[in-house]
């Protein structure tokens, strides 16, 4: 059964490379913690500029070019860009160390967005965050952590001494990495679709705050 095989790949990879999953998760959580702290540093105008960079919906909704279906397109493009960046790290020697920074940056943007909504809108901002930000990010963040761990584990295998046994081992690991990479990319795209559907409907309820500014 294909599903059983994929499940075994996932569990085996998680067990064998748990440290990478842990490192990336800690980097992400650190970013989520740092994000809200940045709100105290900037003035309101700067916060709104950062918000537009941090979230595809606000990037479009706070400009005159906003169209509802544009959020879905922008979110998908953003996730594809992240996938390409993460995969590119697999070809760079420093990529092994840059990947945690990618997750850190993603965590900062997420934490900043939620922190902005909560600090400026109170309970309403918290509710909007729960409904309009967290659902899709459960998929997006899981996909980023998984894909990052796959790339990091692939780089570790490449470092091992070459031998006939290693080559066969490497081929098997490469096949698994490709399958897992595709799976995590699909998870990311599911998150992007959710973002395109949920954000205009839920985060749209926050626009009255910006209109009053």
Give each language-model segment a name.
Residues 59-89:
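Interfacial helix-start motif at the membrane-water boundary
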Residues 146-213:
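Terminal transmembrane helical module of multi-pass membrane proteins
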């Amino acid at each position: 059964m294909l599903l059983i095989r994929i499940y075994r790949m996932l569990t085996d990879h998680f067990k064998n490379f748990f440290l990478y999953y842990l490192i990336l998760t800690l980097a992400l959580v650190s970013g989520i913690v740092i994000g809200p702290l940045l709100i105290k540093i900037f003035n309101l105008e700067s916060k709104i500029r950062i918000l537009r960079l941090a979230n595809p919906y606000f990037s479009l909704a706070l400009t005159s070019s906003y169209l509802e279906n544009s959020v879905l397109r922008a979110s998908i493009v953003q996730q594809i860009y992240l996938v390409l960046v993460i995969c590119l790290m697999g070809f760079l020697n420093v990529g092994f160390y840059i990947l945690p920074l990618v997750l850190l940056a993603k965590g900062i943007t997420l934490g900043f967005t939620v922190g902005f909504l909560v600090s400026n809108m109170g309970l309403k901002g918290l509710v909007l965050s729960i409904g309009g930000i967290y659902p899709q990010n459960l998929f997006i963040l899981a996909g980023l952590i998984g894909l990052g761990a796959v790339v990091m584990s692939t780089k570790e295998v490449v470092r091992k001494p070459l031998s006939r046994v290693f080559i066969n081992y490497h081929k098997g690991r490469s096949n698994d990495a490709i399958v897992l990479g595709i799976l995590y990319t699909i998870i990311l795209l599911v998150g992007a679709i959710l973002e395109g559907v949920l954000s205009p409907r839920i985060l749209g309820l926050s626009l009255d705050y910006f209109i009053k500014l």
